[in-house]
Every structure is written in structure tokens, then in C-alpha cells.
Regions:
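Small/polar beta-strand repeat architecture
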Residues: 46-123
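Surface-exposed, low-hydrophobicity beta-strand/loop segments enriched in small/polar/acidic residues
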Residues: 1-47, 53, 75, 94-98, ...
Length: 167
């Protein structure tokens, strides 16, 4: 059996942990008094903040001068509104205007416009902590881990810290 060295990275706010091809093996994070989220992207550029709405299974994303064209693939995460959210994942987009594009969600529902979304080249995983979860939370990724081609970026909201283990 071949051994693979595992490395680690630690952040206290959003940013890159490593650039280049790596496999994400495990994640740990510490929450705060407020519920938090860790979104992990495979990218060489920082994710872009946008807003979204959902009607049935169609999600409309709004970002001024987004620069995307129909057929581009984006990794996107969606904030929760009224107890519901879009499904985080990688989607092929349809450009509907200079400031809007749509994706088809695998789930459906209604979410009002103006709800936060974040997108980048590829989404890898998301983890949540509950309010007052001030303890270490650990997730071991099975198999060989999740392959990141470009680099690993952690988008952190209401987290004290996050560590990833990769190789």
C-alpha cells in the first residue's frame, strides 16, 4: 500500500489554504455564538458574492456584470431564507442578461430575491455549525478524498477557525 503524506492548513478567516492539485482528506472547524458555515471551493480566484431567488426549480442569480456565458460551469453556495435554500453544487449556467444567469436546482421551492449566494469555478463541500457550537467539529472524507484541481479556498462565515487536511 502506497503512503501519501498529508498536510494541513489553518485559517481564521476566508482565504486560500493551498494552490494546485490536491485531495481534500478532512475538515475541522470551531464555531462561534452564531450559527456558521464553511464553504469549500476549488479555485484560483476568490469566490464572488451575488444574490439569488428561486421559483420552483429555477434559481436566478444576480451579479452586476458577471461576465459569464451560457454553458459555463460554476460552483455555487446559497444562503438560507425562510427555512429554505438553493442546493449547493456545480451547475451549468444559462445567461439571461449582463447581470443575471439561471441554474436548475435539483430541489424546488420559493425563495425571495436578494438572498445571498457565492460562486466560483467549482464547489467541493459545505459544512454548518449551530449557534453556540464552540467545540471542534471534524469531518473525515471517505475514500481518497475530494479532488481539487486548482486550489482550495475556504469561505468562512461565523467561524472561529477552520483546518483542512489534504495531500
Amino acid at each position: 500500500m502506497m503512503q501519501t503524506d498529508v498536510k494541513s492548513g489553518h485559517l481564521n478567516n476566508s482565504g486560500f489554504v493551498v494552490l494546485g492539485r490536491n485531495r481534500l482528506k478532512a475538515v475541522s472547524m470551531v464555531g462561534t455564538a452564531t450559527a456558521g458555515t464553511l464553504d469549500i471551493f476549488d479555485t484560483t480566484t476568490a469566490p464572488v458574492a451575488a444574490t439569488y431567488s428561486r421559483t420552483a426549480a429555477v434559481i436566478t442569480v444576480t451579479k452586476v456584470a458577471h461576465g459569464l456565458v451560457t454553458g459555463n460551469v460554476v460552483g455555487i453556495t446559497f444562503a438560507t431564507a425562510s427555512g429554505s435554500s438553493g442546493t449547493n453544487g456545480n451547475y451549468t449556467i444559462t445567461r439571461t442578461g449582463a447581470d443575471t444567469f439561471t441554474v436548475t436546482d435539483i430541489n424546488s421551492g420559493t425563495i425571495a430575491g436578494g438572498t445571498a449566494a457565492t460562486y466560483s469555478s467549482l464547489w467541493l463541500a459545505s459544512y454548518d455549525t449551530g449557534a453556540s457550537d464552540l467545540f471542534g467539529n471534524f469531518a473525515l472524507i471517505p475514500g481518497e478524498g475530494i479532488l481539487a484541481i486548482n486550489g482550495i479556498y475556504l469561505s468562512m462565515s461565523n467561524l472561529l477557525s477552520a483546518n483542512i487536511y489534504y495531500g
